[in-house]
Amino acid sequence: MLRSMLVVLALLASAPAFAQVQPFPPGFATREIAVNDVTIHVRTGGRGPAVVLLHGYGETGDMWAPLAADLARDHTVIVPDLRGLGLSSKPKGGFDKKTQAGDVLGVMDALKVDTADLVTHDIGNMVGFAVAAQHPERVRRFVLIDAPVPGVGPWEEILKNPLLWHFRFGGPDMERLVAGRERIYLDRFWNEFSADPKRFTEASRQHYAALYALPGAMHSGFSQFAAFDQDAIDNRAMLAARGKLAMPVLALGGEKSFGPMMAAVMRAGASNVTEGVVPESGHWIMEENPAATLKLVRGFLESGR
């Protein structure tokens, strides 16, 4: 652990743009929470009903700073880095989303949070779905943003999209191929999945590229995708055994990305789905149109109070 922290500090010191990403408000604290076989890096702030924000691939919990700053006015905001990503520890396995749901629930338990709203993006959607499907009593409202969930709806058709070739890209040789070229690899995601790549700023690119260059981080990223087949099996089994999610769900798609299809897909896995579209945005909603995203998320959360 000490060696890993020294590596992190060295990277921070050598990357001048690292601090240019919007910071969390001064009232937020960070802590490391030991859960299962990992240590999860968590940011917390605010006071009120709890809301958990889960990031996806190509980013970390840092993506949520603008939303967290607003929600902290009347919520307790909890922002973890997923296992293996950001400043969380880097295990060799456990990247199926049922296991990662256990990480999230463990964080909630450590913070003495019984129930929470979930706001999730990309792979965070998949972890959040596993939380909500296994423990619906702990999720009040659920916002999923711009990524499908394995095994839910037309998953096999979605996999045929040529833009999603990275779902099958991984393994030791692929890790060697990308090692030292993390920025080049990640630029492909930030460019191809943006409505306007310029909105994913150079500061953000340097920030996340440095985090994904940490030892074990790219292995963790590839492992998130490698687990999709098992995730699909698990999700189909949970839906067959327990039925669709019953809590209110907001399915948001970027206008230039999933758009209204996000809600159409999620209706296969949830019975109370509200459709939402983030205008003038591709996949990276917090970089491309944070104001509209914030308005849609806050409006949905407030409708349940």
Language model segments and positions:
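Flexible "cap/lid" subdomain of the alpha/beta-hydrolase fold that forms the substrate-access gate
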Residues: Q20-F28, V38-I40, A50, L85-V119, ...
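Conserved HGGG/HGGXW glycine-rich cap/lid loop of the alpha/beta-hydrolase fold
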Residues: V38, T44-L87
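Catalytic histidine-centered segment of alpha/beta-hydrolase-like enzymes
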Residues: S281-P290, L294
